[in-house]
Amino acid sequence: MSKVGSYAARTDTGKKRRRNEDAFVLAPPLFAVADGMGGAQAGEVASKLAAAALEDTDPGRITGPERVASLIQEANRRVHERSSIDPATSGMGTTMTVALVEDGGVVIGHVGDSRAYLVRDRQIEQITEDHSLVNELLKTGRLSPEEAETHPQRSVITRAVGTDPDVDVDSFVVDTRDGDVFLICSDGLTDMVADDQILDVVEHNLGDLERAAKQLVAAANRGGGEDNITVVAFSIGGVDGSDSVDDTATMEAVALPDDKTTENVAVRAVAPPPGRARLVLAVLILVALLVSLLLWGLLR
């Protein structure tokens, strides 16, 4: 039987952004990170709407991957509905990575390029797949891992919550062991800090996930802090309820902003066009690549 041990979260605007568009959920047994996009305040609205939907949606008796997928689909409905009626948020969207601890293990739901990691036996494994243009190029052999790290379109995502009426959700169950640590984070961390560095920080702070989260955010800022940074960590087994949220990362992170609360809003570190345009651009590039591969095969 899976049981939540300690848990912690931290979010930071980073060094290059004026506002924070990330949101998180720290409500055991439910954990999540959302990284909004859309420019102005739209990205922050999207991430907060999606995060709030996770906490106030009753999935009924559904369990496992279907439950997590239904939660994300409800978040998608709310974000898309808001963007459809509010011109100021048109085209907004958000990534969403969710972990739900159940008796059968940890259920993961995922859309976008935020990530979930599992730390076990002194090893780290990325358990979600990035829905991004760069990852598609990697899978087809068009880019090397080294080229992907500096690719100018590495922030272009191919799937997001809220940009369309429906969304495909990756959902699956991870079997757990006592001592496992799960880490959910926005790309503001993973673009700045390598996986082996993340592992090193977690391994040195297994008994203090609050400290681990703080050190990971600090490492991302030392690496440049080019985007908002959000980290949620929780362990399996051990003592219940040792939660920690830093003073800038309270549960207000899932509250909807009003006209007077703009200091925590941020523009996502994305060079390409925001919102739906990013998805369209990604699709067009993929089509062009497929055509070029077909022509290359015919001419051989």
Regions found by a protein language model. Give the residues of each.
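PP2C/PPM-type serine/threonine phosphatase catalytic domain
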Residues: 1-300
